[in-house]
Design a protein with these regions (language model features):
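Rhodanese-like catalytic fold shared by cysteine-dependent sulfurtransferases
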Residues: 1-31, 37-41, 49-78, 92-124
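Conserved G/P- and acidic residue-centered "switch" motifs that form tight phosphate/ATP-binding loops
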Residues: 45, 88
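Alpha/beta-hydrolase fold nucleophile elbow
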Residues: 81
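Short, surface-exposed ligand- or partner-binding patches at beta-edge/loop junctions that are enriched
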Residues: 84
Length: 124
C-alpha cells in the first residue's frame, strides 16, 4: 500500500513540475512585449491551417506544429522567432523542437496564446 502512495506522489510531483516549469530557452511575453518585438522577427503561427484561416495575427506565417519537421528549414537561425498557438501548449512544443533540431536560440512565445490576443487580426 505504501508503494502505491509513493507512485501516486511521484505522478503528482511530475505533473505539477510539468505545469509550472518554464524552459530556459523560451521567453514568455505579455501581448505588449510581444507586439514590441515581433515586427523585427519571424512571427510563426503553429496552429493548424483551419485555425489560422479563422483569424491570425497580422504578418504571421502559418507553419503548423504537424508540419514543423518538414518545414523547419523555412525558419532562420539568425533572427528571433516569435511563436504562438491557441493557448500556448503547441508553441512550447515548437520552441523545444526548434531549439533541439535547428539550434534556434532566440525564442519567444505569446503568453496565453491567440485566445488572449486583443490586437489586430487578419481573416482569410
Amino acid at each position: 500500500m505504501e508503494f502505491l502512495w509513493i507512485i501516486l506522489l511521484g505522478f503528482v510531483v511530475y505533473f505539477v513540475f510539468k505545469r509550472f516549469y518554464k524552459p530556459k530557452y523560451l521567453t514568455s511575453l505579455s501581448q505588449e512585449d510581444f507586439v514590441k518585438g515581433y515586427r523585427k522577427a519571424q512571427l510563426i503561427d503553429v496552429r493548424e491551417p483551419r485555425e489560422y484561416e479563422g483569424g491570425h495575427i497580422l504578418g504571421a506565417r502559418n507553419i503548423p506544429m504537424s508540419q514543423l519537421r518538414q518545414r523547419m528549414n523555412e525558419i532562420r537561425n539568425d533572427q528571433p522567432v516569435y511563436l504562438y498557438c491557441q493557448s500556448g501548449a503547441r508553441s512550447k512544443q515548437a520552441a523545444q523542437f526548434l531549439k533541439k533540431k535547428r539550434g534556434v536560440e532566440d525564442l519567444y512565445e505569446l503568453q496565453g496564446g491567440f485566445k488572449k490576443w486583443t490586437g489586430k487580426i487578419k481573416k482569410k
